[in-house]
Amino acid sequence: RYGFGGAQRDPARALGGLIRGFIRALFVLYTLLASPFGSYVEPLIIMAAVPFGFIGAVFSHLFMGIDFGMLSMFGLVGLSGVVVNDSLVLLDFVNAEHQSGKPMDEAILSAAKIRFRPILLTTLTTFLGVFPMIIERSVQAQFLVPMAVSLGFGVLFATVVIMVLVPALTMLQHDALGRFRVRKQRREAIRQAKPEVA
């Protein structure tokens, strides 16, 4: 058998710890979201855009010719927080509009129009905040460039996905829940219509 040691072993251990910590953080995040929403599905809708942010970060590394390393992973962790925040803002406003009496399709359209500007501003301020680091060419800054690329370009890609994915998944969930309720009512009506056997 063989194994890496020295300088190779430390990053491998750190990467394993980062992945385990990230999985725990996602579980805690899901729990914290499920409690106020009172739903097991809506937190998954909020977190569904996180993998797309990762895709944007990976492609940005390929486009810029930057190796994907440990600091890139740190950028993905920060990216997850921004993506979840944007999705949460959108879905919470959809629920508020729906609870005010609007049909779900109108609530989704209204939320997408009203919350588009805040979500876009959050994305642009995050990207512009790390952009000077992305274009910095000094030797001292090269250490942090992969993290800035992951966060900056990942949030740009994820925002586009959020504005399409979250409304679509919310509508699918609403339709599925409506069909489930109709079937339940039909079963209940059939059960009550059957004559009781003495």
Model-assigned labels for residue ranges:
Residues R1-A176, A198:
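C-terminal transmembrane helical bundles of large multi-pass transporters
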Residues L172, A176-R187:
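Short helical patches
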